[in-house]
């Protein structure tokens, strides 16, 4: 079948979780990450993801994932990424992008800025809109990794609920979507 592609594959953690029945390809800029993938027998390419995608034929990939990558892209690069995903995915193909959730004030104000290569936070509503605008279907936002409940306020009031949502809510989110059928 068609390959599953992981952009920003790191040391291959996600590639190793994908079914071996599929061809799995990791793309990463970091040579040490690519070497770590090779040492595990994983196929990985050291290349800019946009360049790699541009070299692929239309409708040639089953799914594209990118965990904690899109926050490193300019708006123009994110647009190009979505355009290339739309082009190379086979009909019904899937994208999965995970990124820090700026709805969580702690994540947005502190954790996001611990990585100087993060360009800007991407609110879930914006990402959902852009993915839909680019023609993807079945677009869903999945809020992930809430701060442990023991850190939340210990009272039942509207103020506590709102504070919990803003400070202790999901630290990340994923957007999933499918390319339409022909």
Feature map (PLM): residue ranges:
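A conserved beta-strand element that flanks and buttresses the S-adenosyl-L-methionine
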Residues: 65
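Short, glycine-/aromatic-enriched active-site segment of Class I SAM-dependent methyltransferases
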Residues: 97-118
